[in-house]
Amino acid sequence: MEDVFTYDLTNPVPTLGGAIYWGLDQWGPVDQRPILDRTDVLYHRSDPLPNPISIIGDINLDLTIASDSVDTAFVAKLCVEEASGAVTCLTVGSLRCLYRQSWSQPRPLTPGESSPLTLRLGHMADTFPAGSRISLLITSSDFPRIAPHSNTMAAPWTYDEIITAVTPYATDRVPLPAYIYQ
């Protein structure tokens, strides 16, 4: 699947819950529905699950990305959409594209050129109940959990130049280490 969104540093996606405790009214598992209508948040979900599925292991998201800037970031949240409609984040990962190949040798994007990107969402163990949906949110910000970035090669928290990035991507795969109940 291919989608496009625009990231604007002056209007970052707000952090809703999660594993940070400072500066947030709510932390821990918080419903993500308030951010789903944003044009810079893309939401994918499965059909309702006919049986429970347990996911246990390390979660990675493989994307093919492009941008009209030399750097941008991706944030992905693996969530459960409950039968009630609540969307709860189970694990989250983020990566500034500059570091997609190496932390020690940053490499800019070539504007308009496709590049593979793997987002590590970390280890998790959870059971998605029958009737729920596996869902995925993709965006470029999660403030204040991660610092907004300028879409340039500048150091974090440096905003001498700010570029709005238009970012197409294709979701290649989200391999889930799953146990499907029979």
Question: Which positions does each model-derived feature cover?
Answer:
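C-terminal, loop-rich substrate-recognition/catalytic regions characterized by aromatic stacking residues
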Residues: M1-Q182
